[in-house]
Amino acid sequence: MAPLVGLFLIWAGASVFQQLHPVNGGDIPDPGSKPTPPGMADELPTETYDLPPEIYTTTFLPRTIYPQEEMPYDDKPFPSLLSKANDLNAVFEGPACAFPFTYKGKKYYMCTRKNSVLLWCSLDTEYQGNWKFCTERDEPECVFPFIYRKKSYESCTRVHSFFWRRWCSLTSNYDRDKAWKYC
């Protein structure tokens, strides 16, 4: 047992020493000179930056809607962090998500993070540039009855569920669409 403890201490000590970085003091200042804190320059930078005249606002507000003509990227539903303020993206409540919707050839049955940091959904069944950030109210509804492995279910089920959590299908036929959510 003692040899194992010794090997462990050697391994742990070596790991600690490998993580240490050498400290280089640099040039030694002349005796009697005033010390300068690291990173301090004698002069401040003189660069200036021209900002655009428009008023900008961040878009991290939930429930934000953007029409296609305001889209900052080609067919990407995520606005830039600085988007022009307008009447549409200041709206807090908007139309409902169109579930299921198709975006770039893939069908979505719930909000997605595709090309985005935040959850969003399309307002059209075929994505045409009209979209919004999702809220708690934008969750898709369970569809009852639904078919799972050729059996009909009238309510949420725990069959084949991870940790026995109840789930439901988002379409009438799970076997065909594979769309589901936890209840």
Curated annotation (Swiss-Prot):
Similarity section: Belongs to the seminal plasma protein family.
UniProt xrefs under SMART domains: FN2
UniProt domain Fibronectin type-II: residue ranges: 92-136, 137-183
Signal sequence segment: 1-25
Keyword Cell inner membrane applies: no
Disulfide pattern: 97-121, 111-134, 142-168, 156-183
Organism: Bos taurus
Protein's cellular compartments: Secreted
Xref: Pfam families: fn2 (PF00040)
Record InterPro entries: FN_type2_dom, FN_type2_sf, Kringle-like, SP_Capacitation_Regulator
Protein name according to UniProt: Seminal plasma protein BSP-30 kDa
